[in-house]
């Protein structure tokens, strides 16, 4: 099943989206920061539509990665800048929907004045990276 490669992939900092965009996930002591980047993604439509599509795609993958890595506490998401309030609301709604099935209490607090998404997720167990580090220590 290639479990080792899947576990290694789940710890990588950069996650590629199907569209060619990326998520960069940086857990630190105080919070986790997730940065959404365009990378290779270039839409054929207007820039604003391209940004919206990439941010919407990122919402689903962010929810998947947060659950997979069991991230908790304060999570800040730096979406690609959106000009229109309608697009910002669509992305917040998509993020709410992506976390709706999460069994761990997750609250999307909204956007800051800098356009960062603030969210919190209750800690239910240690993050994946912590569990794997402890497992490595016991095998040494």
Task: For each feature predicted by the language model, list its residue ranges.
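A contiguous, basic/glycine-rich beta-loop/short-helix subdomain that forms a polymer-engagement track
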Residues: 1-23
């Amino acid at each position: 099943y290639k479990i080792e490669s899947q576990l290694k992939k789940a710890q990588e900092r950069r996650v590629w989206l199907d569209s060619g965009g990326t998520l960069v996930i940086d857990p630190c002591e105080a919070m986790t920061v997730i940065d959404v980047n365009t990378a290779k993604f270039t839409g054929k439509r207007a820039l604003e539509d391209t940004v919206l599509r990439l941010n919407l795609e990122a919402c689903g993958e962010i929810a998947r990665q947060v659950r997979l890595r069991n991230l908790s506490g304060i999570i800040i998401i730096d979406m690609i800048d959106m000009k229109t309030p309608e697009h910002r609301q669509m992305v917040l709604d998509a993020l709410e929907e992506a976390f709706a099935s999460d069994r761990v209490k997750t609250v999307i607090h909204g956007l800051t004045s800098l356009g960062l998404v603030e969210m919190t997720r209750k800690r239910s167990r240690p993050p994946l990276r912590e569990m794997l580090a402890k497992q490595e220590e016991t095998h040494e």
